[in-house]
Amino acid sequence: GVNGQMITLYDKSSHIPLMWTHLIPATLEGKAMHNVQNAMFAASIAFSMGVSLDSIRQGLRTFDTSFFQAPGRMNVYSEHPFKVILDYGHNAHAVGVMADLAQRLDVGNRRLVVLAAPGDRRDEDVLDIADAVSGKFDIYVLKRDDGLRGRDADEIPNMMAGRLRSNGIADSAIQIIPDE
């Protein structure tokens, strides 16, 4: 379709166009594919429970990813000369989804990512998070999480930096922030 895809419900032989994905605020004009999927699931579940089409459309039109409706989940801040997307991606898949979204967004200059991971993550999970962003940003800012959970203060950021380097990211593109 024009500017996006249509979410369509199928009920037996009925084809019910529901809403263009680019009109759903939580999809960032259809670019946040994970939220397109979430909208599809929510719409189909609501429809199967007998919720009216108008109510489903209203719900999709009015739900966004602001801090007030979804704290820590793809919160977009545009008050600066640049855009910030804050998401508490708690595993490599979630971080990868955000990295993929960043690739689909038009940016004026460069893409920067800030990464942290709690200390209770397995080493391989931390490395997978670094892999999920490798090559998708211009600058990689690594910081420690407040939850060290038995790890040394900069162990996680240093582990991520090592993986980024082994994935071909230049030292000049990697910054470690030891403390805020």
Q: Where do the language-model regions lie?
A:
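C-terminal helical cap/extension that packs against the catalytic core
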Residues: A130-E180
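Nucleotide phosphate-binding/pyrophosphate-handling subdomain across enzymes
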Residues: I16-I139
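Short polybasic amphipathic segments
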Residues: G4-K12
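Short, flexible, mixed-charge acidic loops at enzyme active sites
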Residues: S13-H15, I156
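Generic beta-strand/beta-sheet core signal
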Residues: Y10, G89, V114-A116, K143, ...
